[in-house]
Amino acid sequence: QFFAIDYFNKVIRLACLLHDSGHSSFSHQFTRVSTIKKMMSDPDLFKKLWGNITVGELYKSSPVVIEHEHYSIRCAYQILLDTDVLASGINPIDVLSIMETTSSTPSDLFCEHAKHFWEFIVGETNESAPTLVRELLSSIISGEVDADRADYMLRDGFHSSVTIGGFNLDHLLSNLRFGWAPNEPWLGLAVTSKGLSALEDFVYSRYQMYRHVYAHKTALGFDWLLREAINEVLEDQSISEYVQLCLTDLNEFRHLTDNYFWECFRNYSRKNPASYSYCIINRIKLKHIDTQLNLSAEQVDSNKGLLAKKLNIPLEEVVTCTMNARFSKIRENFNEMRVLVKDPISHQHELKLITEVSSFFNKFTDGTITHFYKKPSILVS
């Protein structure tokens, strides 16, 4: 059982370290660039990325749309292969199997350790143990309360000098348990009733970070300028061809960094002062003129026209940026995580759905934030 715990500890730490290794330049903004989207919609891109490597163990079929998570799997595969983690007693397929997008079956070693791990938690054997343990580990990598969110919320709150992203991580972690409901069967993370308030703080803090930091008018405005600047420099055939090469060749993909595009922006802005690249290099921001919540696409267009009329400017000078402010997946039938409740009379513990214990998660809903801007005069002229 000790060796099983040690093995899963190493597997999950490796998965946490590698799960975002497929992010390219400027993280999520890169894959939102319209020209990049077209490149990544190439039906042969997945096959080109993997070359002669057999991926049957990882994917049952080639994905229709390539996302950064697919690049993370490709990068993680190569890193684990090059560092020869197999010689250290860790099967790379086990690390990849708990990361997003894969549909792989864990190794025999994983299954053996899962059985011992299961006996440690439950005290008896179960044929479904490998599957249930893999799903449990996957939820820690990518779930409603995962390692990534716990990390970036505190980090982003600190570096943006705000307190709204704060929550008591130590209290939350100390009140997390393994939950096991044998009648279903269900295995997953459970939070004690004492730690439920920390979970509520965690979810609400993330919601507030999206509303006030990630969807801040200045942040979204520069995100828009950045995407347009990337589109702009990709009009150069040599740059476009190199980026396409990077998206299919892992040796080149590692060179597709922020610095690469910053140099492209500098070169382009010297020759073209009335450009998005010039705005990015010289920190010329969009002029914010309005913010609206939860607008439909038709309402966005309508408000855009009204603003253009009020300001007496052409419609094309008004720019919009929209971000989804997702509150939480925790709703009435949410089953990925439960609450461990102690009966005050029998003193027996039982697992309940989070919404059966807390009404907090029904008080908020997902929404959208749309900012409206006027283009800088340098772009208009």
Q: What name fits each language-model region?
A:
Residues 213, 218, 227, 237-381:
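Terminal helices and disordered tails flanking the catalytic cores of nucleotide-processing hydrolases
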